[in-house]
Amino acid sequence: MAIKSIASRLRGSRRFLSGFVAGAVVGAAGAGLAALQFFRSQGAEGALTGKQPDGSAEKAVLEQFGFPLTGTEARCYTNHALSYDQAKRVPRWVLEHISKSKIMGDADRKHCKFKPDPNIPPTFSAFNEDYVGSGWSRGHMAPAGNNKFSSKAMAETFYLSNIVPQDFDNNSGYWNRIEMYCRELTERFEDVWVVSGPLTLPQTRGDGKKIVSYQVIGEDNVAVPSHLYKVILARRSSVSTEPLALGAFVVPNEAIGFQPQLTEFQVSLQDLEKLSGLVFFPHLDRTSDIRNICSVDTCKLLDFQEFTLYLSTRKIEGARSVLRLEKIMENLKNAEIEPDDYFMSRYEKKLEELKAKEQSGTQIRKPS
């Protein structure tokens, strides 16, 4: 589906884009856990039997072998938590907290590998083989770049419980730019909470009927989402009296260029909750003054030149030869992008290192 048609459909629906509206506070839990609590409650017993329970035999019979379990309980890791969909082999939601200190450090993703989550039973897990040759990338919900402070935290983001099948261009492009904006928020907000996850939204057919259908990949039938969502909650500081800032966004799982603005994909929190079946930040006092993050902040993503310069700067560290390093500079010039001071300092430092290394190698190979 084209970006324009999706965006126009979302903008055209008053129910979907009803503005910055707070939803009702309702507890959210896994279906198995909810069922267990429901049938164990005295009120539920009365509803089922038409009378107040008194240790009835019916209750004992129902619970004799237990209720079905869905595995949707919250699973906590070093810097993220998630609820896992055992049927679709993807997370339902992933919650993370980021701050200026957490996005800085020595943790490096080159030491991390995608792997099944050891906490997920293999029967319900996705595997790397499901993604190989599928035409879909392994897309992080909690990104590795938000966990530079801890090698363990970063490695845990590579568990496949934190991954969904994502369009390659979306993963490396628009979604990446949203993640970068979340990190940028830590320059202006002390605490930033982010919830991300997949959506499978209905499509309207020519006959007017709505259909939910989605591709699955691999032997384990990992579900490919039609859309991805991200909810951002930012707090200026723990002692600030300034209202919290919140924004919810839904983007299609397909390539998105540089022209669409993030605000074009903004939805109300209430509408996202209806779509996802989730209640976000249930302990948040929604009767308090909560601001639209796109009004308080910019919601501005990096443009083409800024993003290209950022990627080129990252490539400097991976250059293994002077020739490769000079190619990075050449590509920038061909794109008519002017290097900034930070890029030049990194470039010159790397150039000096590589020249010294190549000169040292030449001297070692020189015959005596």
Swiss-Prot record:
The keyword Metal-binding applies. Its cofactor is a divalent metal cation. SMART domains: Endonuclease_NS (SM00892), NUC (SM00477). Its main location: mitochondrion. InterPro entries: DNA/RNA_non-sp_Endonuclease_sf, Endo_G_ENPP1-like_dom, ENPP1-3/EXOG-like_nuc-like, Exog_C, His-Me_finger_sf, Non-specific_endonuclease. The keyword RNA-binding does not apply. It is found in: Mitochondrion inner membrane. Gene3D superfamilies: 6.10.250.1250, Extracellular Endonuclease, subunit A. GO terms for cellular component: mitochondrial inner membrane; mitochondrial matrix; mitochondrion; nucleus; protein-containing complex. Ubiquitous. It is an enzyme of class 3 (hydrolase). Homodimer. Belongs to the DNA/RNA non-specific endonuclease family. This is Nuclease EXOG, mitochondrial. The lineage of its organism: Eukaryota, Metazoa, Chordata, Craniata, Vertebrata. The gene is EXOG.
